[in-house]
């Protein structure tokens, strides 16, 4: 079998076969038929086959990333791939700790495989349209300021989010972000109905210290934050009513990685503020999806 033909044959098998033993037979035939140079090339292909098979021999969600096949729409590929991730899968998690009370935060190091997170980042860079004009500013210290990042929101019908003097309307879900919302909701065991999407172009973009305590938020719901792109520091600080400086023991910092998720309990959100400070050494884009559960109807006392 000519080397080019075998390569094509292996690629076809990679796309359509779930039988690892069949692929192994081709591997054995290759070791007898080709020189060392091609065998090294074959080993690379075969190792990629192994990496993209799960324990049942079925191709993983990343198969479209290896194919380089652009015959299908990127959005459809992303929706299918995100939807294949099981909320019951084994995720590497880290429970963050503090000496202070009311701190319940879980860090999921990677809910999205790297290549899938790469594709999601590229998709967002091409397709997400961020707010401009009045929706891209906040009212602080008695004057309006431009938001030091880009943002937009999606969610269920008739939802909006008020903060810092502005009212952010929720645009309808698109298929990709809805698929991500469904996955995050299953992992967090919370029916999120709103997402705020923030784009930080580099380490000069940031979000200041704050708590998510707006009246529209369901006070019993956690908040889930998914990151794609540049790794950035995320800092929790114990909230004090008298605004006295927090000691070192009252601060918790974690670097949020590409494809990760941070799950913040409602109790933590009440007693701790959080921020994403400037980091001038960070040169690349980070996009963050902050999933929330909003009240479908405000109480009378919340409508002012």
Where are these regions (language model features)?
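Non-heme Fe(II) oxygenase metal-center motifs and adjacent flexible, charged/small-residue loops
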Residues: 6, 14-16, 25-28, 32, ...
